[in-house]
Amino acid sequence: MLDLNFKGSWRQYQKQVLDRFQDYQADGHVHLVAAPGSGKTTIGIELIARFGNPALVLVPTVTIREQWVDRIQTAFLENEQKISDLVSQNLKEMKALTIVTYQAFHSAMNQLQSQEDGEAEDFVGFDLLASLRAQKVATLCLDECHHLRNEWWKSLEAFRKQYEQLQVISLTAT
């Protein structure tokens, strides 16, 4: 179970989404379309917490990855909680909540070397599926999923065929 508790108050439209959580849980997926700045990241974090399983969050850029970490820290964690105990930004060192870019995921799925915004990672020989299974990841969150590039989509499709038991949260502005 993820120990995340939102410290703020929900906007009416956010509450409407969250009130349907049991429907999403039964369906195994949530697809949320909302305007930029409407709080999709916050809803995504709350849905992950409610699903209660280790989760993998995929984002289009390192900047957005950092925004997720910051939002978790400021809006969900109590003062005594350490973000590093709960969140990882590295597929090779997964935690209950692992947040990486689509590019890093693509590189790991295809066992490639990755270079992104000055961050280098070598996934040659790395078994992403085995690592996800060992971590018992059961929730996948796709942030800004309208930004998916063709090669990222192919990696996600291959992943979904091999890793079927996932609850999927898709967040998009279009």
Question: Which residues does each PLM region occupy?
Answer:
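SF2 helicase catalytic motif II
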Residues: 102-105, 110-170
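Residue-level preference for the first positions of well-ordered beta-strands
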Residues: 29-31, 54-56, 96-97, 139
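Conserved RecA-like helicase motor-core motifs
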Residues: 31, 76-89
